[in-house]
From Swiss-Prot:
Species per Swiss-Prot/TrEMBL record: Xylella fastidiosa (strain M12)
This protein's encoding gene: hemE
Assigned keywords, A-Z: Cytoplasm, Decarboxylase, Lyase, Porphyrin biosynthesis
Protein name: Uroporphyrinogen decarboxylase
GO molecular function, one term: uroporphyrinogen decarboxylase activity
Cellular component annotations (GO), alphabetically ordered: cytosol
A GO biological process held by the record: protoporphyrinogen IX biosynthetic process from glutamate
Subunit structure, interactors included: Homodimer.
Keyword Magnesium annotated: no
Family assignment from sequence similarity: Belongs to the uroporphyrinogen decarboxylase family.
Amino acid sequence: MLKNDRLLRALRRDTVDRTPIWLMRQAGRYLPEYRAARQHAGSFLKMAKTPELACEITLQPLRRFPLDAAILFSDILMIPDAMGLELHFIEGEGPRLGKPIRDAAAITQLAVPDMETELRYVMDAVRLIRKELDNSVPLIGFSGSPWTLACYMIEGGGSKEYAHIKAMAFNAPDVLHQLLNTVTDAVISYLAAQRAAGAQALQVFDTWGGILSPTMYRTFSLPYLTRIARELERGTGTEHTPLVLFGKGNGPYIAELAMSGTEAVGVDWTIELEDAARRSNGQVALQGNLDPATLYGTPNNIAREVQRTLDSYAAGNGGSREGHVFNLGHGMTPGMDPDHVSALVEAVQRLSRR
């Protein structure tokens, strides 16, 4: 039995003694111990593909901060890599895929990878982390969203214009839907395998959903998020594994995401939580949504913004703080001060206590 189940209770909108907190990219370059591990390993991919290293890095922030969850150390591009698109990282530029998808012929050659073969290192990491956590806090597994993965798979990496995928959306939408359906199948299998290996909550990162117009979002992102929420087997009762759908720029679609079948919606800092809570109408828990740049502020300023965020959620939720998971609106960045993270966690714990 979990010693700390606040996260799972909050995601189910049950009563908790205080608002739980975890942070996107809580294991990352802002931590000196992470940088030391990265230097010793020699590459990001070696860390992500070696279960013992992935476990160590996952646990690093838990040793520093009294967080309410661990999140698997990995990368959303492990699925495209396992599909044969040859993931590599270029220093200072980020991830690149050596075999981008540009036509229907390439899509027909894609297959959903075997989760205990091509992606066994991820599942072994999940199993090892669960063992090392020893039921102290829940472990979150994750995947990129179909749209976000397709962006990388078609562009071959990050992009400012997303010209290739947007051209495909306008000129060959059936081809893009074919890719999105294949990727959705892979995401569902990937998350199910993480759950089977021991993940106790799951999150989908729709990082690039916000680049789409409303019509395009409702055509190329939302239907596939909904498929995941409705088709991913998550169990019942004490064996239930809650799902969070997080997206940058998803504010206009919260009401629709709340009806997708997910347990929770993660939002960025471009919408007030009060507004998000009203739009979700009590159908889902909400996760977020402190601007990550707040961590560049003083501890007093951080505490002030924590209070404002907590109050904003309650104002939109009938005065109640239940059903809220505190998080940033996006991930930690390398220049952040670990002491300011400590101040953030302390403020959330102190100010949210019931």
